[in-house]
């Protein structure tokens, strides 16, 4: 129901009201139009402040001169049609990615280097993380930028990998100048892969040095069984006997000059789902290992505490954007990016996982923080899917491509 001056009640199913800026001689005007959809058709009506109807339901109202320029810019921006396209994750700003691995031992590392420094935030949701220099990313800490992020295997043993990365960066003159020495600021998080290949072989400083060198000289990022994804697996609620091989995956997009992408090392306790279709694509195997079953349903078989739950799990991600944000904003974006985990991994963020996400800013593009958080979750979900689809069987563990196709 709607009313107009000087008239009775008009039965209406919907009222459409629009206001838009229009350029005319002498400045900018508002064009206001109210269109009432009646049961027997439409009636356009518009009234100025004095209650006088405008021609064909259109009223022109003068806009103050001080607002003219801003409204013209707003009108131009809102008229643009933004299109989204997929881009390589390696094309976002000055971040360079290098990988090194030991294929036989099924372990490796992936290093993200930004010689100019990058602002970074971190959000940890899992109950068992293995990490280094995480407090550097706390918004309350003094350092505003870091120089590298390391994702590696080896669990806590692999945390020494960052020492090799620091050595390589120091040799290249990259780091924070303390006045007495150059100190590269390097954060790190690891997955547990000691149960996959050789438990005595772990990423070490030499491997970290090589990955950092490659990042600077010959970036070699690839999805699949490479770098930190070399020993990644999923679906381990029953231990390693019924799990599947996954790896490292990436996905990135560009929209209106904004670039955002994610690299994910997929090593979860739970199962993996296509976030768009809801179809399970990896995880716990059936007894004959020819099909998938639900980890969540399996866990619902008993309410008793599980003392021997397999704890060798953690999914790690680095979200990269060319938008300009500070550490506090990046911590929030990293938190929103965890929605991508929740859409794709079930269960997720368990006490037996060390799920963590870094978010880094390497540009000056102005962008809405919440929009970037939404996109971060989406590229994380797509990167998880790529980690499944690009994985190959290894050490006796089948990949998704090895399962019988329906």
Where are these regions (language model features)?
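Classical Sec-dependent N-terminal signal peptides that target proteins to the secretory pathway
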Residues: 75-77
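Hydrophobic core
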Residues: 71-72
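Alpha/propeptide regions of enzymes that mature by internal proteolysis
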Residues: 81-406
